[in-house]
């Protein structure tokens, strides 16, 4: 059983196979004598502790595969010297990322066999690597090789860089070359990142000379619309009537919803929906009673001749789900099939009124559509019809208004069925008897209700016709028949009215309530237009928002798709999950509504001193954001304004708050920034602030200051999407499902507060708002030149030279057109005349790259952990005292913690104490010992 599969599996799991495989090829023949007939090294049996009976002679032992057969192709890279014959030390399990703990990536910081230091010594002499003793770990080398990895490749530190230079180089020359190396390294990383992401939409929206302008104009349009809405609410007193306190949560939510309705294009009539009780959302979930109702319908079919119509109720139950499936290109065909029976029914009803002789034909068509209209005349059918209607209402939880419309339609269908059954009579007699004989046709009413729900869910604009009929009470038959053929005409006009609330004339629309889907996984190559093309298949689609990519998610993005409130959002989500964009699963899930829209902040914010500080900070933030987007600028942005902005940004903040701004919210704001105190009175009365500091003082509210602050806070929240009390900004909020969704307000105040607490709170809060207080100034031309900025004319010249090829003497080729010329000057003229668009693309590419460099907050890969931790780790190791180590490679540990001046003492490792001192030249403290004064002097006494 020695050669069983279990033995091979055990060998495959052997954790020391890497070490044995790495040094077996060099020293097996020298270590053991070759015995028996096994002259070749491959015939030697391995020393396996699990093979007790295997002989080492190898004569009768069967040849077994090598370890590498189980490990896959490729040999494991060995970090030791290839000329050493000693086996490497026991390999500890690596902990990737702890580069400052271990001496070598393969061997841990703790060397159990105390051989690694000497191996490192010889490795520095005979290493084949360019930097002795510094082969990068496997994962680091793999991670640094790609252009789109999580971190940049590791940059050489000064000691590693010195190993690549001549030994006779001076210190000043070393520092100059190392500075050039770091600059070139940074330029290379920026250029590689730009090349890797320049074709992605999110990157173009930030820096492309054309796309970025369009995006900024779009955002400025959003902000201008928000500003208009805020000014309208400020003038009519809506803003001034609310306090940003958590106790007034309902009033704050009403103000935010009012803004959303106005942003959606709503009117004052639509604002009345805020006074109404919010309606329950439309639920389209299928229940278990659905199949029971289908079975009951099948039981009512008595004639076998009518089996052809059995698919009708089943298909009508599936129709509400069909528009939201992924393959919904044939909705028009379904609508045409549904509208055709309606037109036939309308024509048949007309003929039944005017021509009594067509009664039999009318009966046939009615039977074909409604399946069994003449067999259910008993009272039991009425009870079954009512129970079916109740089950239908439970299955489709629609609004009360829609249920009333369905009942009205069912009543009219009963009247039509009664007329068709009783024969030709006058219209008045039909109407009078139709009101009395409403008991039969229970199955017909149920099927009609199915069809009405079908038509309402698939094309809600058709539901406007029952409303017109119900307004007239009973309504004449001529009006009803005249409305149905005009459905096609009305459909063209009302294609946008998907919301049921919009169809109802004269009723407010709940524009602030939406349904949404969250996309967890969007590849960087997916564009907004591709997502919109997928979402446009579903009814009720409004907009899509795509977040900026995240480096920790490998530049994958998240997205939110917004639909109208009354759509079947779960069916749409299911349809999106069955689709892939560019071979990427979007991971669509239903986005829940916001749980708490008003969230409390620290109650100390209501204190008068804190309120005055908040007014100052809010004014600075509002002024900076207004200047950034030029909201209140009278004319185009000129050089003088930009220069003044640069000067104020260098000082950290603008010196004026309301003087140079046309914003009415910032007018006369300095009147509230001047602090007042009774200093003289306190001095005369001998009052000091010691008691206040120890015992604290009660919260002092100044309603006038609070009203000014609330106006500023609401301005920042509504216009700039900045939640001041949460010190954050909600990005791309105009495209999100919930505009103005969350706001933080002042919470319940504490009983007493000390002056130290107030000052500490103000200081900490100001530090949290630094991202809004400091202006983002683009880098200057000199700064981007150091980062590798390109010149447009130089790049155009390179483009011309690259497209000028010499074939022979006096024969030149232009690869762009394939034409041949006698000289390069003719090709140059040809390119500028015939390929001007190519030259413009080169200039745009240069501007594209320079725009990326000008952004001080440009996206880029984070630095390698070894690069960022290097200054601390080197000082922690104790390495230093010169540029070049005398003979040992850096970061090597000597046996038993012996440390010369150039080396760090100790074996390292997190779970091992530092090694004992051997009394080097500089010891930590003076050692105290006992010395007998009568004893002779010797060299063993302590100092």
UniProtKB/Swiss-Prot annotation:
Query: Where is the segment annotated Disordered?
Result: 1-100, 284-493, 637-662, 851-886
Q: Which family does it belong to?
A: Belongs to the ARS2 family.
Does the keyword field hold Nucleus? yes
One Pfam family hit: SERRATE_Ars2_N
The disruption phenotype is: Lethality.
The primary gene name is Ars2
**Which positions bear Phosphothreonine?**
300
Q: Which GO terms describe its biological process?
A: defense response to Gram-negative bacterium; mRNA splicing, via spliceosome; negative regulation of viral genome replication; primary miRNA processing; regulatory ncRNA-mediated post-transcriptional gene silencing; siRNA processing
**Biological function:** Acts as a mediator between the cap-binding complex (CBC) and RNA-mediated gene silencing (RNAi). Involved in innate immunity via the short interfering RNAs (siRNAs) processing machinery by restricting the viral RNA production. Also involved microRNA (miRNA)-mediated silencing by contributing to the stability and delivery of primary miRNA transcripts to the primary miRNA processing complex containing drosha and pasha.
* One annotated Gene Ontology cellular component of this protein: nuclear body
* Biased composition, class Basic residues, residue ranges: 362-371
Enumerate the UniProt keywords alphabetically. Nucleus, Phosphoprotein, RNA-mediated gene silencing
Question: How is the subunit organization of this protein annotated in UniProt?
Answer: Interacts with cbp20, Dcr-2 and pasha.
Residue ranges with Basic and acidic residues bias: 8-33, 40-49, 284-308, 340-361, 388-419, 474-493
Q: Which InterPro entries does the record match to this protein?
A: SE/Ars2, SERRATE/Ars2_C, SERRATE/Ars2_N
Residues where Phosphoserine is found: 81, 303, 309, 326, 349, 352, 426, 640, 642
Q: Where is the composition biased (Polar residues)?
A: 456-473
**Main localization, broad class:** nucleus
**Biased composition, class Low complexity, residue ranges:** 642-653
The subcellular location is: Nucleus
> What is the name of the protein in this document?
Serrate RNA effector molecule homolog
- The lineage's top-level taxon is Eukaryota
Which residues are recorded as modified (Phosphotyrosine)? 79
